[in-house]
């Protein structure tokens, strides 16, 4: 499981960007900066393209990292772009997709799930047509340059029944199994807050994607799945588990690579004076109350230079004395480090407790939850700041739902059963239907 840093959100990040990419290697940079203007077009795409090249030159190339490009479709969802400009949006994306493939390692499909502003667009015909046009454009470019097949991620949407049906039909009707090697799951930003669910909502879609991969032209190629915009510890624990479980399924077929992106580590560091800091040392998770308490050796390992070390020490001194930081983002790289250490810890725990085998041995969700509950009891005693009551409940609810899909997967992968399970999941999530 890999975390992808979301770049480009703040101006003049400078050394902070490099301090982060030295850890993550990879960074996600969006085209949104060239698409939210009233007069957006090829000229504004040229500017954001130059920004991405410059970011890559300064922050990913020096560390042997990679750029992932987000399509900027969020501008459409938010209403910065109206339906009358869809073709211009598709054309701008196409120019970047076709011409900048040596700059980016991966790129996400241009998706238009609905519009928060232009409600007249939110009907099945218009949404399907817009996304069909976008995907047909991408397919045409891929056919001209087969290198792009390995770089292209198809973004799935699923939180409304009509939406999932459309994306499923797009995949089938456009024969995307011949073109799509990599998959991503979108629509999850703010989903828990909007619905009140505690469990991780992406289990069903992950199994659906895995099944699509096994019926595609790319069986045997690495199975890559990206989760857009997740950040909670319980969600990341589940991604780490799914990666291990799917690798077990595909042991004789291919490798599995899962990843996620989030702006949360940087935002949390800006907004909160006290957030726990984690460091995994010799298999033990060290927990500090805040970045102010961490050993100087960790400061040196994260900072990009002796000068940066001094800047950080001065910021820690300001924080300790109740003064305002000179740069609100100063501790962002430290929170990224902390979250990466927590991710490693989750992966270690999944192996230590052999949770994949626990899933495989369980003959019912009740038996599985009993076993998982015992593990979580131990972990909450040893690491109460990580495995809080809320996190434990979320993990248990998520594993219960994962068992249903595991049972489906190992017992024939019946398409009719999958459809029924998927509709049950969507109804359970309960996101308001916005599509007529």
Question: Where do the protein language model's features map onto the residues?
Answer:
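Glycine-centered secondary-structure boundary/capping sites
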Residues: 60-64, 146, 175-177, 249-254
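Hydrophobic, Leu/Ile/Phe/Ala-enriched alpha-helical segments that form helix-helix packing faces
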Residues: 92-100, 134-146, 170-175, 209-218, ...
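Alpha/beta catalytic cores of nucleotide-metabolism and tRNA/nucleoside-modifying enzymes
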Residues: 1-32, 94, 212-223, 244-436
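Non-catalytic, usually N-terminal nucleic-acid engagement modules in DNA/RNA processing proteins
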Residues: 1-147, 380, 384, 393-396, ...
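Context-gated lysine
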Residues: 25, 36, 57, 66, ...
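Serine/threonine-rich low-complexity intrinsically disordered regions
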Residues: 21, 36, 44, 79-84, ...
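Glycine/Thr-rich beta-alpha phosphate-binding loop at enzyme active sites
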Residues: 123-127, 151-244, 253-284
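Sequence-level detector for tyrosine residue identity
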Residues: 3-5, 74, 93-96, 101-106, ...
């Amino acid at each position: 499981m890999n975390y992808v840093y979301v770049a480009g959100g703040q101006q003049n990040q400078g050394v902070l960007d490099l301090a982060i990419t030295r850890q993550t290697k990879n960074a996600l940079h969006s085209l949104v900066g060239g698409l939210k203007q009233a007069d957006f077009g090829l000229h504004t795409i040229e500017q954001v393209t130059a920004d991405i090249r410059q970011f890559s030159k300064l922050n990913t190339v020096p560390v042997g990292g990679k750029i992932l490009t987000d399509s900027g479709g969020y501008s459409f969802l938010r209403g910065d772009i109206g339906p009358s400009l869809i073709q211009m949006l598709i054309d701008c994306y196409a120019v970047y997709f076709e011409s900048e493939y040596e700059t980016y390692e991966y790129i996400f499909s241009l998706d238009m799930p609905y519009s928060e502003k232009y409600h007249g667009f939110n009907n099945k015909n218009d949404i399907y047509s817009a996304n069909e046009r976008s995907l047909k454009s991408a397919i045409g470019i891929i056919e001209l340059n087969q290198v792009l097949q390995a770089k292209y991620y198809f973004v799935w949407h699923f939180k409304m029944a009509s939406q999932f049906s459309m994306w499923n039909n797009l995949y089938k009707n456009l024969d995307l199994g011949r073109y799509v090697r990599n998959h991503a799951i979108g629509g999850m930003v703010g989903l828990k807050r909007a619905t009140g669910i505690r469990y991780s909502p992406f289990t069903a879609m992950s199994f659906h994607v895995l099944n699509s991969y096994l019926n595609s032209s790319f069986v045997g190629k690495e199975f890559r799945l990206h989760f857009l915009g997740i950040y909670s510890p319980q969600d990341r624990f589940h991604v780490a588990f799914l990666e291990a479980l799917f690798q077990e399924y595909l042991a004789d077929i291919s490798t599995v690579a899962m990843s996620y992106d989030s702006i949360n580590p940087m935002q949390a560091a800006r907004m909160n004076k006290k957030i726990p800091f984690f460091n995994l040392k010799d298999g033990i998770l060290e927990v500090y109350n805040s970045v102010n308490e961490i050993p100087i050796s960790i400061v040196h390992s994260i900072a990009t230079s002796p000068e940066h070390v001094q800047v950080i020490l001065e910021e820690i001194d300001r924080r300790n004395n109740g003064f305002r930081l000179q740069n609100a983002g100063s501790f962002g790289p430290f929170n990224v480090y902390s979250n990466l250490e927590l991710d490693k810890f989750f992966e270690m725990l999944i192996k230590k407790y052999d949770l994949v085998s626990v899933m495989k041995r369980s003959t019912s969700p009740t038996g599985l939850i009993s076993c998982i509950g015992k593990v979580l009891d131990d972990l909450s005693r040893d690491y109460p700041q990580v495995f809080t009551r809320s996190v434990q409940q979320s993990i248990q609810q998520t594993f219960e739902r994962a068992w249903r899909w595991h049972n489906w997967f190992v017992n024939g992968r019946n398409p009719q059963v999958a459809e029924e399970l998927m509709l049950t999941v969507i109804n359970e999530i309960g996101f308001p239907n916005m599509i007529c």
